[in-house]
Amino acid sequence: ALPFLYDDLDGFENKIIYYESSRGCPYRCSYCLSSIDKKVRLRDMQIVKKELQFFLDHDVPQVKFIDRTFNCNHAHAMEIWRYIKEHDNGITNFHFEVSADLLRPEELELIGSMRPGLIQLEIGVQSTNEATITEIHRTMELPRLKEVVKEIQSHENIHEHLDLIAGLPYEDYATFAKSFDEIYALRPNQLQLGFLKVLKGSYMYEHAKEYDICYRSKPPYE
C-alpha cells in the first residue's frame, strides 16, 4: 500500500492537496505517458474513504484528485462521490478530471444533487478537430460531451473547467480557432489553454519528426 503523506498537515495551509485513488488509464492518448501501460489500478476503497475522511475532519480547503480519468470505472467513481456527498463538511472542495462523454445518467444525477462548490470538474477536450482527435488516438464523442457540459451547468452547483491543447498534429491556426470558439461557446467557468508537451517514451515523441513538431529538448518539452 502507498504511504499516506498528509498525516501532518503543517506546511499545507492555503495549499492544494493532491490525491490519487487510482493509477493508470485505459485510453491511448498519444501525448500521455499513462497510455503506455493501459492497466488501471484502483486503490482499496476502505483506505481511500479513511484518507478522505481525514481531509474532511481537518477542513482541508481543496483536494485535487489526479486520477488520469476519474470516471473510467463507474462503480469506483460513484462510491467516492456518494461518500463525499454523505460526509460533506460544508468546506472542502474536491477536484476531478473526467471524460464528460462517459458520464452516465446516474452519475449526473448524483453530482447534480451535491452542495454547490462540493466538487469541480476538469474536462479535457483538447481539440474538436476530428482529424486531430483520430490521430492522437483519443476516444471522445463531442456531441455527447457538449450535452453533458450543458446538463452539468443546468444545476448551477459545479465549477466546470474545460481544457484545450495547442500544437497537436493536424491542427493549424484555423482549426485551433474553431476548437476555441466551439468550447468557449459552451461557457465553462474556466477554459484552460495548454501547449503540447512531447514527453519521452510517448507515441507523440516517437513520431514527432513525422509531424514536423518543434519542441524543447528540456523540461517542460513544449
Q: Predicted regions span which residues?
A:
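Radical SAM [4Fe-4S] cluster-binding motif and immediate context
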Residues: L2-S154
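Conserved C-terminal portion of the radical SAM core fold
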Residues: L56-I66, I91-E97, G112-S127, T139-Y221
